[in-house]
Regions:
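Acidic catalytic/metal-coordinating carboxylates
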Residues: 34-38, 60-64
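Active-site residues of response regulator receiver
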Residues: 54
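Receiver (REC) domain active-site loop signature in two-component systems and cognate sites
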Residues: 57
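Alpha4 helix (beta4-alpha4-beta5 surface) of REC/receiver domains from two-component response regulators
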Residues: 64, 85-101, 107, 111
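Short amphipathic alpha-helix used as the core "switch/output" element in two-component signaling
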Residues: 41, 63-74
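Hydrophobic/aromatic residues positioned on beta-strands within the core alpha/beta folds
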Residues: 79-82
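Two-component/phosphorelay signaling modules centered on CheY-like receiver
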Residues: 13-31
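Non-catalytic signal-transmission and effector/linker regions of two-component phosphorelay proteins
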Residues: 1-7, 13, 107-120
């Protein structure tokens, strides 16, 4: 990859680490954030090419994060990743590009990220 940066936003450290490892195998650069507030700070430091976003997190959840991104007029593709059955609906609510239902495997993750990057 030409240094394509993916920001992984999830309150579960094991999920962040596993997703980062899978993406790095495929050549993506990753950064991790434990909640929406940490993600906004990470974006201020260096804007990613894509965001993988959990919806249910403490401090600032996925909805609040997406609202703040919209308020700041930041157009970074977002993939919602959640264990809830409503992943696709939630993705639609926040105008995300795609969704992944947890648990997801390597192939689903890489296919979704590649599709979103191809559409960007």
């Amino acid at each position: 990859m030409d240094d394509i940066r993916v920001l992984i936003v999830d309150d579960e450290p094991d999920i962040r680490a596993t997703v980062a490892e899978m993406l790095e195998i495929e050549g993506y650069s990753t950064e991790e954030a434990a909640n929406g507030a940490d993600a906004l700070a990470a974006i201020e430091r260096r804007q990613p090419d894509l965001i993988l976003l959990d919806m249910r997190m403490p401090v600032l959840d996925g909805w609040g994060f997406a609202a703040e991104m919209s308020r700041r007029e930041m157009a970074i593709p977002i993939v919602v990743m959640t264990a809830a059955r409503d992943a696709a609906r939630w993705a639609s609510e926040i105008a995300a590009t795609a969704s992944l239902s947890k648990p997801f495997g390597f192939d689903d993750l890489i296919r979704t990220v590649n599709e979103v990057r191809g559409a960007a």
